[in-house]
Structure formats: C-alpha cells, structure tokens
C-alpha cells in the first residue's frame, strides 16, 4: 500500500496528510506519478482517497511510479500473486520477510510477547539466532551470548524478555494460529477455526472441505490453511514448537444463546480513550458475559 505525504486542511477543519493508492492497478488507472498534483476527497466523509490527477500541472522530469520487479532487500524476483493485487518477494529465505513474520508473530494480535521490539528482531535475524518462529523459544539457550553481545540489553532486560517468551508458551492456541501469518487468517478467523478444531494438530489432518465448514472460511482461506499445514517445513516447525512446550490446545468455552447471538457489531468513527482494536476487544469481552 503506497502513501504520499501531503499537507491539506479541508473544509471540515481536519488535516489530511496521507491518502492511500492501494496497489499498482490503482496507480496505473489514475496514471499518477512522482511529483503529480492530485485531487483528494473524503469517502463517506471519513477516508481520504485520491480522485484524479491534474495532469496540466505535471512537472518537468515527471516519472511514473512502478513497484520494483526485484526485492530491494535480497534481490530476488518479485511476482504478483494470482487473483490478487499483492506483489511479493519470491525468495523463501528473504530476511525482510522473516523479520515481518516474526514481528507479526510476537505482536499484540498474535502471541502478544511484550517488549520484543523490532530492533531486537532485526538484530536476532541478522545474527542468525532466529531462522523461524520456533527459534524464538530457544533463545533462552543463548542467554549468556545475548547478554554478552547486548542484543536485548543488559542482564535484567534480557531475562525479562526471556521470561515473557517462556510465559507465552501457555497462550491459547488461537494466538499461535494467528501468529503463523496464514493469508486470510487473522485473529477473529483463528478464534472461529479453533472452536471447530480444538487443537493445532487437528488442522494437520483437516481437508479443505472440513475447513470450509467453519463459519467465514471460504475456498481461498481453506486452501491457504490446507497448504500451510501440509508444507513439510511448517510441519517440522510445528513439531518443534510442540517439543518446546508451546501450547497447541484451545481453551474450552461454553456457547450460550443470548439476545446478541448471531449479531454483528460494527465499530466506526473515533473514541476519545480507545483505539479501534481496544474497543473491539472490550466489546468482545463484554459479549462473553452477555
């Protein structure tokens, strides 16, 4: 998703500094390039969107923007995924992809390993301590080296993070499933899936038809899940996680019919003390006891 810094104050009195250009198809359709003057409007009076390009104001030396055909980090070819607008690096060993995968895994929406910052992740990947997510739970075996090199900080900081990682082994299995980074499987989908398959290991035996029986899991999502759990490297990684004591089981929950059963809650606009994610979590927790 490409964004261009702007400085605009609209008639509603709000400042607009960014407007999304979505993907290369959208950029091509608009014929927008570097240095162009654009017209921006608020979709639904909320979301800034680019409406058109003022080509009569196009500067000398104008350049069309093109997404690179090689990865800027590892140099491997990039390719567009079938039936999507996503362009990705084709190398399975790309350090940038591994870094983003680990950042997603330890993030709040997944395993929620607090204090595991991006700077630490980048350095641990660069030095070879982390090659996949299972390596995270073996960092304790390198405690002395980590302290000596100061990768996470001094002894106190290192021990604190290692303790947090150890505690994360007890997380509900939906958090682990979210952290795998399977396309189309976010936190909400992971929770729904784990209600149908109470163990991560059950997903290794599930076929596409069984996966599609889960609410909100369509053909594309089912195929992504199936391919992930039938990939030999992923199977080895999951086996390592299990041997390291990472929980594979979902917490048992009781389903109770109520006045809000089957309803969809939509959060829009802004709240003075809560972000969107915090508000969603509050609603979800309240509905558990409704």
Please report, for each region that a protein language model flagged, where it lies by residue.
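Short, charged beta-turn/beta-strand-edge "cap" motif at the junction between a beta-strand
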Residues: 39-48
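Cys/His-rich short segments
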Residues: 48, 52-110
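DNA strand-break repair and replication-stress modules
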Residues: 98, 105, 149-288
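Short, structured beta-strand/loop micro-motifs enriched in basic residues and often containing a Trp
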Residues: 13-25
């Amino acid at each position: 998703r490409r964004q261009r810094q702007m400085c605009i104050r609209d008639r509603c009195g709000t400042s607009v500094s960014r407007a999304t250009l979505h993907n290369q198809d959208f950029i091509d359709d608009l014929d927008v390039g570097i240095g162009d003057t654009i017209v921006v409007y608020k979709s639904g009076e909320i979301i800034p969107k680019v409406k058109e390009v003022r080509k009569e104001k196009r500067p000398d030396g104008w350049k069309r923007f093109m997404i690179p055909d090689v990865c800027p980090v590892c140099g491997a070819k990039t390719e567009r995924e079938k039936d999507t607008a996503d362009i990705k690096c084709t190398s399975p060993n790309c350090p940038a992809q591994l870094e983003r995968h680990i950042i997603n895994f330890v993030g709040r929406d997944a395993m929620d390993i607090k204090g595991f910052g991006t700077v630490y992740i980048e350095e641990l990947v660069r030095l070879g301590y982390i090659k996949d997510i299972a390596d995270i739970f073996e960092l304790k075996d390198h405690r002395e080296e980590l302290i000596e090199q100061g990768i996470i900080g001094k002894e106190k900081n290192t021990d604190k993070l290692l303790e947090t990682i150890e505690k994360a082994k007890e997380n509900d299995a939906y958090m682990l499933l979210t952290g795998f980074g399977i396309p189309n499987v976010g936190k909400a989908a992971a929770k729904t899936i784990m209600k149908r398959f109470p163990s991560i290991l059950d997903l290794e035996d599930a076929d596409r038809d069984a996966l599609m029986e889960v609410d909100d899991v369509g053909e594309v999502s089912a195929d992504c899940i199936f391919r992930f759990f039938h990939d030999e490297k992923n199977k080895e990684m999951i086996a390592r996680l299990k041997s390291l004591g990472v929980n594979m089981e979902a917490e048992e929950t009781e389903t109770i019919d109520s006045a809000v059963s089957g309803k969809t809650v939509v959060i829009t606009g802004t709240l003075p003390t809560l972000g969107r994610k915090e508000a969603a979590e509050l609603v979800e927790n309240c509905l558990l006891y409704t």
